[in-house]
């Protein structure tokens, strides 16, 4: 048996009083974060040692809450977790994995807070979620989680002023039996910039271009936003409309990728792909930056990885410099002229095979290389 953590996101429909509490908590969390960041910077200037997260928490309880009594009106775990998040940022900086923590801005920073489960203070009901201080908040519940152990909850206000809560559950389940890789339970996928992927079986995932579909409406709303006075009520109203379109696009994309990755994980145990640098490929120099960002291929691979591992399989990544598009899958001949990406079909001068589809051939080669890495081929 193994323990794993899994988060489930629920849409919240708070009443006016609960919204006020959430807003107050967001503000207090931001205030404590900025105050402790200021304390740490002041200690650094005075050549004093760095405060640990426990010392920062004591400082908050003994000093900040005494001076600013309104901090006691919100969930204490929210303030503690804000301090822990600040310490995490410092530790990342010390390990050269991130930059120095920055002060949180009221209008630009993400509005969220995290609270911990203790004494049944968090509960998922049939049509509500109970949260500390807020009580029962109306929610959209789609999964039965009564048998799962709750660890924490993160309340977030989206840019379009909708609310959601991400609840972290601890799941105890049997360790998946590792499946032996074979030719039949393995598939190769080649990245397709104007879709999603092409498989070695010839299946093409023509993912809808959700961003392009909403581009005209988004541009119209952004033009209206540009003409508003920054900081005015109408500016923030229009900003909410723009954010709603972005969230709709993101939800469409995520829904499609979940369905596509689940279908593949149910049919195959091992999926072979190229280890591409999606961030570099989205640069303007390639000429297809928007298409690359729109299809969310990196997110798709992340989904595939954990879904395959849950079933005893795995995602196999082939080296990005492997010339999958240049090698004839029938005879192994490497054709250098295929460095020209405009060539979509070609004839092999070595074995005589004609009308070879570039993408399907690449997917077949990726599968063969993946099987070799798995010790099958």
Predicted features along the sequence, with ranges:
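Gly/serine-rich nucleotide phosphate-binding loop at the start of the catalytic core
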Residues: 1-79
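Short flexible coil/turn linkers enriched for glycine and charged/polar residues
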Residues: 4, 158-161
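Generic detection of short hydrophobic beta-strand segments and adjacent strand-loop junctions
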Residues: 10-12, 137-141, 204-207
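Stable alpha-helical structural segments in soluble proteins, enriched in small hydrophobic residues
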Residues: 36, 82-93, 360-370
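Long, hydrophobic, amphipathic alpha-helical segments used as structural scaffolds
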Residues: 37-44, 90, 94-101, 171, ...
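Acidic carboxylate diad motif detector
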Residues: 55-159, 290, 294
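Positively charged, helix-rich recognition surfaces that bind polyanionic ligands
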Residues: 146, 160-377
């Amino acid at each position: 048996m193994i323990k794993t953590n899994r988060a489930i996101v629920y849409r919240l429909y708070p009443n006016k009083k609960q919204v006020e509490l959430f807003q107050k908590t967001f503000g207090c969390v931001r205030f404590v974060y900025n105050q402790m960041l200021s304390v740490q910077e002041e200690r650094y200037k005075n050549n004093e040692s760095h405060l640990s997260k426990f010392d920062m928490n004591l400082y908050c309880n003994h000093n900040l809450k005494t001076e600013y009594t309104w901090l006691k009106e919100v969930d204490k775990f929210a303030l503690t977790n804000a301090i822990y998040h600040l310490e995490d940022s410092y530790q990342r900086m010390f390990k050269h994995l991130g930059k120095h923590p920055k002060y949180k801005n009221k209008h630009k920073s993400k509005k969220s807070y995290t609270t911990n489960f203790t004494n049944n203070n968090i509960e998922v009901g049939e049509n509500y979620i109970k949260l500390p201080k807020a009580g029962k908040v109306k929610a959209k519940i789609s999964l039965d989680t009564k048998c799962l152990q709750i660890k924490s909850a993160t309340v977030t206000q989206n840019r379009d002023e909708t609310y959601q809560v991400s609840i972290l559950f601890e799941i105890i389940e049997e360790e998946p039996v590792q499946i032996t890789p074979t030719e039949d339970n393995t598939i190769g996928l080649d990245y397709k910039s104007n879709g999603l992927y092409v498989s070695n079986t010839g299946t093409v995932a023509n993912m809808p271009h959700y961003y392009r579909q909403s581009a005209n409406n988004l541009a119209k709303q952004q033009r209206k936003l540009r003409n508003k006075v920054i900081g005015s009520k109408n500016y923030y109203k229009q900003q909410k409309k723009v954010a709603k379109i972005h969230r709709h696009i993101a939800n469409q994309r995520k829904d499609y990728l979940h369905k596509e990755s689940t279908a593949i994980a149910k049919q195959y145990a091992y999926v072979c792909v190229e280890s591409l640098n999606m961030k570099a490929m989205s640069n303007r120099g390639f000429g297809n930056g928007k298409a690359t960002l729109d299809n969310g291929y990196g997110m798709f691979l992340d989904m595939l990885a954990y879904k395959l591992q849950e079933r005893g399989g795995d995602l196999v990544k082939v080296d990005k410099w492997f010339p999958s598009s240049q090698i004839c899958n029938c005879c192994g001949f490497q054709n250098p002229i295929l460095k020209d990406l405009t060539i979509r079909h070609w004839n092999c001068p070595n074995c005589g095979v004609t009308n070879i589809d570039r993408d399907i051939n690449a997917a077949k080669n990726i599968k063969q290389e993946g099987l070799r890495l798995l010790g099958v081929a």
